[in-house]
From Swiss-Prot:
Name of the molecule in the record: Small ribosomal subunit protein uS7
NCBIfam families xref list: PRK04027.1, uS7_euk_arch
Gene designation per UniProt: rps7
Protein task: One of the primary rRNA binding proteins, it binds directly to 16S rRNA where it nucleates assembly of the head domain of the 30S subunit. Is located at the subunit interface close to the decoding center.
Family: Belongs to the universal ribosomal protein uS7 family.
Length: 194
């Protein structure tokens, strides 16, 4: 029987995409999981560990966000196939590694500043605060998926195509992207309440 070393096996996401990508934002490096996995499905092993979701592959976190309440709630295989098809579309349209495009989209659409409510003596103040890196990634993924769902709802365009277009638009910092618009809105509100 042959023995294989784990390091010698070249794992790629969906059997196609390499996870050796560049993260330019230093604050997000720890929170964008790029470990090589063939099937991004950990089954909630991170659930009870503090900052456990930071170790989750970023593709799986995208899949989990596609499963948000609504039509796709709890249907992980459907979400998996949506993301897989969206990645194929991204590769066809851009000619780049879709994981690199996704990471760039997350970097561009992650808000840096937001508003929090502070109650002081019965009066509510809105104060601008910096966003934690983990929350930046969470918000970016959520807004990317929300934009895709909004674009494909009551529309003949399939969600796979909408998700691919949203990720490509966010990666190129296009103001037509829902995630970029949402980020700018959050930062504008934070700027006004400094």
């Amino acid at each position: 029987m042959e023995s294989f070393e784990v390091s010698s096996i070249d794992l790629k996401v969906f059997g196609k995409w390499d996870t050796k990508v560049e993260i330019r934002d230093p604050s997000l490096k720890k929170y964008i999981g790029l470990m090589p996995v063939y099937l991004p499905h950990t089954g909630g092993r991170h659930e009870h560990r503090r900052f456990g979701k930071a170790k989750l592959p970023i593709v799986e976190r995208l899949i989990n966000n596609v499963m948000r309440p609504g039509r796709n709630k709890g249907k992980k295989m459907l979400a998996y196939n949506i993301v897989k098809t969206a990645f194929d579309i991204i590769a066809l349209k851009t000619g780049q590694n879709p994981i690199q495009v996704l990471v760039k989209a997350i970097e561009n659409s992650a808000p840096r500043e937001e508003v929090t409510r502070i109650m002081y003596g019965g009066i509510v103040y809105y104060v601008a605060v910096d966003v934690a890196p983990q929350r930046r990634v969470d918000l970016a993924l959520r807004h990317l998926v929300m934009g895709a769902k909004e674009a494909s709802f009551n529309n003949p365009k399939p969600i796979e195509e909408a998700l691919a277009e949203e990720i490509i638009a966010a990666a190129s910092n296009d103001p037509k992207s829902f995630a970029i618009r949402k980020k700018e809105e959050i930062e504008r509100i934070a700027l006004s309440s400094r």
